């Protein structure tokens, strides 16, 4: 998770899973990872731990690319598509390698991994280490007005998507990574160019099914 909204949606999903498995079960079996890269979660870690919904809550000191000065040379414009592609391949490999020491848990040991905003460093790490995962849209219907994958890879998008989805030579976010199994979105019809891996899982039913006890847990984590 990178934002409070991500944590909120994770609560909704985990509460639904708990209810379906055993309504009397109090302790969850999932690990919640809070990335510190783009948000200061303050004391959210301890507040979430107090709910008992997750087996453990970890903080991830995820590093942006500018933290590693050795990556800067791969961002230089060579003036040619093939030259830039060669640099991007090297960038993808090196970024994943450099990020590895900051990942706080062995993700290979998990059955299911859900990642919000896989455009962040964790997406590079997972794909270059051949770890399969499920992506989740960064914000509610966020792809309706801005498709980051297509914008960031404008110019020869289909070629870049192929190199990412099938060859894993570069990384394209939002469902186009080779090891991204699918990507959850709230409303596929709102997306102009949906990726074949998008699956529609509306958020409203997750909220509508909340019990009084569920709402108290949410208040405990986010308000009280």
Predicted regions and their residues:
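Active-site and donor-binding regions of nucleotide-sugar-utilizing enzymes
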Residues: 1-175
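A nucleotide-sugar donor-handling region in carbohydrate enzymes
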Residues: 137, 144-224
């Amino acid at each position: 998770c990178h934002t409070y909204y991500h944590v909120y949606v994770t609560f909704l999903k985990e509460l639904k899973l708990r209810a379906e498995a055993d309504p009397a079960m109090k302790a969850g079996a999932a690990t919640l990872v809070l990335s510190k890269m783009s948000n200061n979660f303050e004391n959210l870690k301890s507040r979430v731990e107090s709910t008992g919904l997750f087996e453990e809550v970890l903080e991830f000191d995820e590093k942006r690319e500018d933290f590693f000065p050795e990556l800067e040379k791969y961002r230089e414009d060579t003036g040619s598509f093939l030259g830039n592609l060669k640099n991007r391949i090297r960038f993808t490999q090196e970024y994943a390698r450099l990020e590895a020491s900051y990942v706080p848990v062995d993700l290979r040991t998990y059955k299911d991994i859900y990642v919000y905003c896989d455009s962040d460093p964790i997406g590079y790490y997972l794909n270059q280490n051949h770890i399969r995962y499920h992506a989740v849209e960064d914000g509610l219907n966020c792809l309706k007005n801005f498709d980051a994958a297509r914008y960031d890879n404008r110019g020869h998008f289909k070629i870049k998507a192929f190199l990412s989805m099938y060859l894993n030579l570069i990384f394209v976010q939002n469902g186009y990574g080779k090891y991204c199994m699918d990507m959850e979105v709230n409303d596929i019809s709102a997306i102009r160019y949906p990726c074949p891996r998008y699956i529609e899982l509306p958020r409203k039913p997750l909220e509508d099914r909340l019990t009084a006890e569920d709402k108290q847990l949410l208040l405990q984590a986010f308000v009280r």
